Amino acid sequence: MLRTTASRKIVLRRGLASINTGTTVASKKASHKFRNTFWTIALSATAFYAGGIIYSQKNDKFGDFFSNNVPFAEDLLETYEHYHDRPTLFLEDSWDGLKAKSNDLLSGLTGSSQTRRSNRENIEVKKILSLEPLNIETENSDPQLKEIIGSLNDLINSLNDSNLSIPESEFNSIKKSNQNMLTNLSQLNETLKEALSNYMIQRTSEVITELNTQYENSKREFEKNLQKNLLQEVDEFKENLTKQKDKELEEKLKANEELLQAKHANGVGLLSITQVKEFNKIIKDKIEKERNGRLAHLEEINSEVNDLSKSIDRSSKILSKNEALVQLTFQVDEIKSRINNNNLPDVNIDKELSRLKLLSNLLSTFNKKSCCDDGDCCSCKKGNKNEGKEGKISCKCKPKTNPPSLLSVALDELESTCSGKKILSNEQIYNRWNLLADDFKTASLLPPNSGILGQLTAKVFSLFLFTKTGNPSNATDFDSVYARVGDNLRVSNLNDAVEEVVSLKGWPHKVCESWIEDARRKLEVQRLVEILDCEIRTL
């Protein structure tokens, strides 16, 4: 802190006086510093006690600690509670005290003015204030006490640094007060340590008791909840187990019922077979007995047996035809699923075609017409003029040649289209079209009769072209055609895409020839498979 010129002169004069006589002349400024220091200490103590009293009213534990360990704290708390509980008494005492203080103040003002005048005239012997700091072990003390001791040491150091000159009597009293304060603070520190230790022990026991109580309560609640959850889980498990067992029992009963029905059906079938055998045996015995006498009846039986065999043959043909149609439908559906599956890059349907060919030949044998227009062969008719002596009829009808069916024609076309060749999926066709982008751009720049130089030039300039995407307008330039084809392939519109590519001419058409062949093969196979499906459904 910088000092003025006047203060420097006073300090110099004070130093010279102390050197010569050992005493210093008290100045008005030195007494003013001491008064400020005194008021600072008083205000700090007042604030400390006031804060402790106010916080003690809010926290009972701190109030006990404050009244037991801080000097004069208990009396101040009792006084505060006395006037706080009886506010009218406080007003009466405050009024009486105010009147007494006003009288004392008036008398003090007159006396103080006289004493000040006498002090100015008299020169007292004073000493430089030098206080010892508070050396108290605060390693395990309360943090607030540490803060108080630190603040007091800072205050003592500031007083020592200010070089205050005070009278000898006041110097001795201050030294004594410092020693008393050191003793009281040491006692307070020990008391605080002991109280803190007792408080920690008591609080620890309370916390342990509280924790034990909470543990017991939580334990009982947990056991209750656990028991409730276990009972609920047992009920749910019991219910689920009951449902599962009922379901298993129902399934077993159903299986046993089906088994009994199957056994019953087998028994009925076996019984019918046995009855037929017995019937045949009886018929055979009767025929053997009456063979010689009843040939007419034997011929009637023979004709009925022939009719029965024809009916059986027709039934077997119908069943075989239906089975052949079912197998044809299954094979056609298999081919359709394979050619429409995008997970397969290419498909070979030679095996399916051979099966279709075999089933078609089998079906054509069932669809053969008789040699006569009425559906029956003349050899099967009775009373015919061509009947011989042995009862046999020679058929003179010319065999009819049936025209090839649509099914066989479609199969032949499908075999010629796909024999030894693979059918690409829509995704594979789209990918191959994307691979033609660079060659397509190069071909779009080539003249009709281009040489090697034209090829190289078109290849170089094609690197600077951009490929169009999306669905542009119906323009005829190569980029628009390429974009429309890509968009049609993206939505699996292969027919329109092939029409766009086929309409190209010159080098672009030549570049796309292999792609056109694969796409046309895919379209032809799809159309032929659709024709086969429709024809089989009509049969």
From Swiss-Prot:
A Gene Ontology biological process term: cristae formation
Membrane topology note: Single-pass membrane protein
Gene Ontology CC: MICOS complex
Coiled-coil residues: 172-264
Topology feature Mitochondrial intermembrane, residues: 57-539
Membrane topology, Mitochondrial matrix segments: 17-36
Targeting signal (transit peptide) range: 1-16
Keyword Nucleus: no
InterPro entries, per database record: MIC60 (IPR019133)
Bilayer-spanning residue ranges: 37-56
Annotated keywords: Coiled coil, Membrane, Mitochondrion, Mitochondrion inner membrane, Transit peptide, Transmembrane, Transmembrane helix
Subcellular location: Mitochondrion inner membrane
Subunit structure: Component of the mitochondrial contact site and cristae organizing system (MICOS) complex.
The protein's role, per its UniProt record: Component of the MICOS complex, a large protein complex of the mitochondrial inner membrane that plays crucial roles in the maintenance of crista junctions, inner membrane architecture, and formation of contact sites to the outer membrane. Plays a role in keeping cristae membranes connected to the inner boundary membrane. Also promotes protein import via the mitochondrial intermembrane space assembly (MIA) pathway.
Family: Belongs to the MICOS complex subunit Mic60 family.
Protein name per UniProt: MICOS complex subunit MIC60
Species this protein is from: Saccharomyces cerevisiae (strain Lalvin EC1118 / Prise de mousse) (Baker's yeast)
